[in-house]
């Protein structure tokens, strides 16, 4: 898929802007605090309906205004599709083909995007919460069913945790409702767990090949899905549900005493193994970065495999965090394959040599100057 056009109205430091993009590489270049990352953020928000930088949508609206609009045209195999997102104090509205969507979940998946920012290099060595967020963010774009099940699980988890605290402090005494919540939570949790197992298995296949190539055949990469049920590729949703619900039943008193849900996919993790060694605990920084790069690049192929369309790739000042070898592999892998948006204060010599006919946008104080480079 290709984002051919983007329009911003009162978004961040952009008052009113329309820009047409190159189907290949688009370089957003400029000094810090000029609007490069804001532009990338707008594309990300148009894709996922939420920002990767803030959970407060009000921050997306220009401080002098009461509402903001992001719209664009995405070109897919089925044709061109207009997309629109409106933000105001009343909430968000999403439109596809000029038709307002009843729920935001119906909108997600129209424009798929993979973000690669410096913080993503911490995917390997960062917290389990970071890796769970990674799974939810990427897999939700590939499957509306996953998006729904993960959303239902989060809602029920909040409800159950609230009720557990009420039981802990004797504000409630009815355990029947707790059993109902646990049953529903186990049902949606099982769906999430089995879907994660499926997606990670496919992601591992793509990432392993890329890692071997980047490491010059010196290293092999494996991804292990760490979960309390110890599911395998053969585990069914029903089996996962029965196992998770039994954990809730067997540990009901313990959960009440702690006032929180102890088991479920909200406790899951991913383990990265390089040459059968846990790279999170024992790998060098270079191995950790190569692993993160392999996984992010593998997402591109996995999303194409699952949806039939290549996603957009958003590179937010990530080249400066990579050495020459990893820059080369990244830029070579995406060449003539996926529409790319790259922010930087200056292009490295490696990037200038490897990027084929980019469109460079010089950004200053929320304005763009476009220059074709042949």
UniProtKB/Swiss-Prot annotation:
Gene Ontology biological-process annotations: DNA replication; DNA synthesis involved in DNA repair; double-strand break repair; SOS response
Pfam families assigned: SMC_N (PF02463)
Residue positions binding ATP: 30-37
Keywords assigned by UniProt, alphabetized: ATP-binding, Cytoplasm, DNA damage, DNA repair, DNA replication, DNA-binding, Nucleotide-binding, SOS response
PROSITE patterns named in the record: RECF_1, RECF_2
SUPFAM superfamilies xrefs: P-loop containing nucleoside triphosphate hydrolases (SSF52540)
GO MF term set: ATP binding; single-stranded DNA binding
Gene3D superfamilies: P-loop containing nucleotide triphosphate hydrolases, RecF/RecN/SMC, N-terminal domain
Disulfide bond entries: none
InterPro entries in the record: DNA-binding_RecF, DNA-binding_RecF_CS, P-loop_NTPase, RecF/RecN/SMC_N, RecF_2
Presence of the UniProt keyword Iron in the record: no
CDD domains in the cross-refs: ABC_RecF (cd03242)
Protein's cellular compartments: Cytoplasm
Family: Belongs to the RecF family.
Its biological purpose: The RecF protein is involved in DNA metabolism; it is required for DNA replication and normal SOS inducibility. RecF binds preferentially to single-stranded, linear DNA. It also seems to bind ATP.
Name under which the protein is recorded: DNA replication and repair protein RecF
Gene: recF
């Amino acid at each position: 898929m290709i984002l051919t056009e983007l329009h911003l109205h009162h978004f961040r430091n952009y008052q009113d802007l329309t820009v047409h993009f190159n189907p290949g590489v688009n370089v957003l270049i400029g000094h810090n605090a000029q609007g490069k990352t804001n532009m990338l953020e707008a594309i990300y928000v148009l894709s996922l309906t939420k920002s990767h930088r803030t959970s407060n949508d009000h921050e997306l609206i220009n401080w002098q205004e009461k509402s903001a609009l992001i719209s664009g045209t995405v070109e897919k195999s089925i044709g061109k599709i207009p997309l629109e997102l409106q933000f105001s104090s009343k909430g968000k509205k999403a439109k596809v083909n000029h038709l307002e969507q009843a729920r935001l979940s119906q909108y997600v998946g129209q424009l798929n995007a993979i973000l690669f920012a410096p913080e993503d290099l911490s995917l390997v060595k960062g917290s389990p919460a970071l890796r769970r967020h990674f799974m939810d963010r990427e897999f939700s774009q590939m499957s509306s069913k996953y998006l729904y099940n993960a959303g239902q699980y989060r809602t029920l988890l909040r409800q159950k945790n609230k009720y557990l605290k009420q039981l802990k402090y004797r504000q409630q005494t009815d355990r029947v409702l707790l059993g109902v919540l646990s049953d529903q939570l186990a049902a949606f949790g099982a769906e999430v767990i089995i879907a994660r197992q499926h997606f990670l298995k496919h992601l591992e296949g793509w990432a392993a090949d890329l890692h071997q190539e980047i490491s010059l055949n010196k290293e092999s990469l494996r991804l292990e899905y760490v979960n309390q049920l110890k599911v395998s590729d053969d585990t069914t949703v029903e089996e996962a549900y029965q196992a998770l619900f039994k954990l809730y039943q067997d540990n009901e008193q313990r959960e009440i005493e702690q006032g929180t849900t102890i088991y479920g996919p909200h406790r899951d993790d991913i383990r990265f193994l390089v040459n059968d060694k846990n790279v999170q605990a024992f790998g060098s920084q270079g191995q950790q970065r190569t692993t993160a790069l392999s996984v992010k690049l593998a997402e591109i192929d996995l999303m194409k495999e699952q949806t039939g369309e290549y996603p957009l790739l958003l590179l937010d000042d990530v080249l400066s965090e990579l050495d020459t070898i990893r820059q080369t592999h990244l830029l070579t892998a995406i060449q003539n394959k996926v529409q790319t948006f790259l922010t930087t204060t200056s292009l490295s010599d490696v990037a200038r040599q490897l990027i084929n006919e980019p469109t460079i946008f010089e950004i200053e104080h929320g304005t763009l100057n476009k220059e074709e480079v042949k």
